[in-house]
């Protein structure tokens, strides 16, 4: 017993400063393992047990401060010492190497470009300029149209989660990467094999067991997924750099090559951005189609808004609606439907709710507003968006799918700073928001222009039971909704 106690003391570091009290759900050696396995219940229990909504917990030898409430949320999002790249170690999924000790941060993420931007941030923003998106529209609209035309070959019954996820990956890859990854069937098959591995595999548990890296299946799966993506994109980048033919490709990768970017930076950008650009969109897109299909009044309202936008912007307003969509400019896709925008915010609020990671990279402690407690220098800090997105005050009946809460006359979330965090907030807003909204508008526009949708079972029999999009709240990594099916009725 004495030996075990000495081992425990030697394993647990001393923390200086007036930190929040430790949550009762802390166990020797492993720490608060329910942070991984029961994200929602762990967070709520820790809040209830704390005196002010702030608490400490261990993940192995890693001390983490959990914060909640408006003032702490504002500090978390706006303090310049809170680094989101170094804090990603608390997330545990995606293509970046995380072994439980540190995240290996590539140079594409360092803020060394003009305006304190990173190479990755600069390219993401450039890819979404109107001139660039205009060049991508013909291929991405063709991808979306072909995908929904294929619904007929599936007996007009689809799993919206799977179909929309694939479409999200396809179109995001065109906008931020290279056409060969989608146009060459072998490349696309590999892409659609590796991306789900990276999407749903979390090695966050290695924070508690860093010594177990080489015995961890998720750790090796993430390395396998990352290496697979590297082997996929590297030959494409290298081939582009050798081409001197005046007839050149016209996609983002070619722009990077023409700019003289290094192969290493381009390869790492493609690997990371193909994943990141669709990480949440691939989950939310299917939830959007599913949710609206179960609300026929919203579906009809959106259909009418799509028709109005097409009539205003299409090259030939007398053409069939789906043909009108093929000719729409970027401006039309950005202003497609106010109702879609409300639904999008509600789906994001309900589905994209998860712990966020930051590291206090400063040399001094950060005081938590409204308390005498601190986030220690060099320490990890976590905020779970369920604190705001499932707040009874900001979102009455938070488990109810209610897009109207974002409309005029409601907007209860505006009572507090950063009351909606669906697009990031503070110092780190989402850089890909423009494309994300266009992409979602595009998928739903073609879906509703071509069909009326209703809920069904796998065999096509009617199913009017609506399952609000809350099932991912306890999962280690975002995953696609399961066992949801829709039936499409072609519009006349």
Swiss-Prot record:
Glycans are attached at residues 116, 335. The chain crosses the membrane at residues 269-293. GO terms for biological process: sterol metabolic process. Its cofactor is heme. Its EC number is 1.14.13.-. GO terms for cellular component: membrane. It is a single-pass membrane protein. GO terms for molecular function: heme binding; iron ion binding; monooxygenase activity; oxidoreductase activity, acting on paired donors, with incorporation or reduction of molecular oxygen. Heme binds at residue 430. It is found in: Membrane. Pfam families: p450. Pathway: Secondary metabolite biosynthesis. Keywords: Glycoprotein, Heme, Iron, Membrane, Metal-binding, Monooxygenase, Oxidoreductase, Transmembrane, Transmembrane helix. Induction: Expression is positively regulated by the cluster-specific transcription factor MYCFIDRAFT_198930 and is up-regulated during banana leaves infection. It is an enzyme of class 1 (oxidoreductase). Cytochrome P450 monooxygenase; part of the gene cluster that mediates the biosynthesis of an emodin derivative that may be involved in black Sigatoka disease of banana. The pathway begins with the synthesis of atrochrysone thioester by the polyketide synthase PKS8-1. The atrochrysone carboxyl ACP thioesterase MYCFIDRAFT_190111 then breaks the thioester bond and releases the atrochrysone carboxylic acid from PKS8-1. Belongs to the cytochrome P450 family. This is Cytochrome P450 monooxygenase MYCFIDRAFT_204672. It comes from Pseudocercospora fijiensis (strain CIRAD86).
């Amino acid at each position: 017993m004495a030996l075990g106690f000495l081992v425990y003391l030697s394993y647990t570091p001393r923390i200086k400063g007036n930190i929040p009290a430790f949550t009762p759900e802390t166990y020797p050696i492993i720490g608060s393992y329910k942070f991984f396995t029961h994200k929602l219940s762990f967070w709520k229990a820790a809040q209830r047990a704390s005196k002010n909504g702030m608490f400490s917990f261990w993940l192995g030898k890693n001390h983490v401060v959990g914060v909640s409430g408006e003032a702490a949320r504002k500090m978390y999002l706006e303090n310049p010492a809170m680094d989101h790249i170094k804090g990603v170690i608390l997330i545990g999924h995606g293509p970046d190497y995380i072994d439980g000790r540190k995240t290996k941060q590539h140079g594409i993420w360092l803020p060394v470009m003009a305006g304190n931007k990173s190479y990755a941030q600069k390219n993401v923003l450039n890819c979404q300029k109107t001139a660039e998106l205009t060049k991508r529209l013909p291929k991405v609209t063709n991808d979306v149209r072909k995908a929904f035309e294929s619904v007929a070959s599936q007996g007009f019954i689809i799993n919206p989660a799977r179909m929309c996820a694939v479409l999200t990956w396809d179109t995001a890859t065109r906008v931020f990467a290279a056409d060969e990854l989608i146009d060459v069937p072998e490349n696309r098959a590999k892409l659609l094999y590796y991306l789900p591995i990276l999407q749903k595999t979390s090695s966050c548990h290695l924070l508690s067991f860093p010594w177990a890296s080489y015995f961890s299946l998720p750790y090796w799966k993430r390395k396998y997924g990352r290496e697979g993506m590297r082997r996929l994109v590297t030959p494409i980048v290298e081939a582009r750099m050798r081409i001197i033919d005046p007839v050149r490709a016209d996609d983002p990768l070619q722009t990077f090559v023409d700019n003289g970017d290094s192969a290493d930076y381009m390869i790492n950008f493609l690997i990371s951005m193909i994943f990141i650009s669709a990480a949440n969109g691939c989950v939310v897109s299917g939830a959007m189609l599913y949710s609206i299909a179960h609300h026929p009044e919203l579906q009809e309202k959106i259909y009418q808004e799509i028709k109005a936008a097409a009539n205003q912007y299409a090259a030939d307003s007398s053409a069939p609606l789906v043909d009108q969509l093929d000719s729409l400019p970027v401006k039309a896709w950005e202003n497609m439907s106010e109702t879609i925008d409300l639904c999008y915010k509600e789906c994001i609020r309900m589905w994209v709710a998860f712990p966020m990671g930051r590291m206090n990279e400063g040399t001094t402690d950060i005081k938590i507003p409204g308390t005498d407690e601190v986030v220690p220098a060099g320490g990890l800090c976590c905020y779970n968006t369920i604190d705001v997105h499932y707040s009874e005050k900001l979102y009455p009946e938070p488990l109810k799918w209610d897009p109207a809460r974002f409309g005029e006359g409601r907007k209860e979330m505006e009572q507090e700073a950063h009351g909606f965090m669906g697009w990031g907030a503070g110092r780190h807003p989402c850089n890909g928001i423009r494309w994300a909204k266009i992409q979602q508008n595009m998928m739903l526009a073609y879906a509703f222009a071509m069909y009326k949708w209703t809920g069904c079972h796998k065999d096509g029999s009617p199913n009017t039971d609506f399952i609000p999009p809350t099932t991912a709240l306890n999962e280690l990594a975002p995953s696609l909704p399961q066992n949801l099916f829709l039936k499409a009725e072609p519009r006349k």
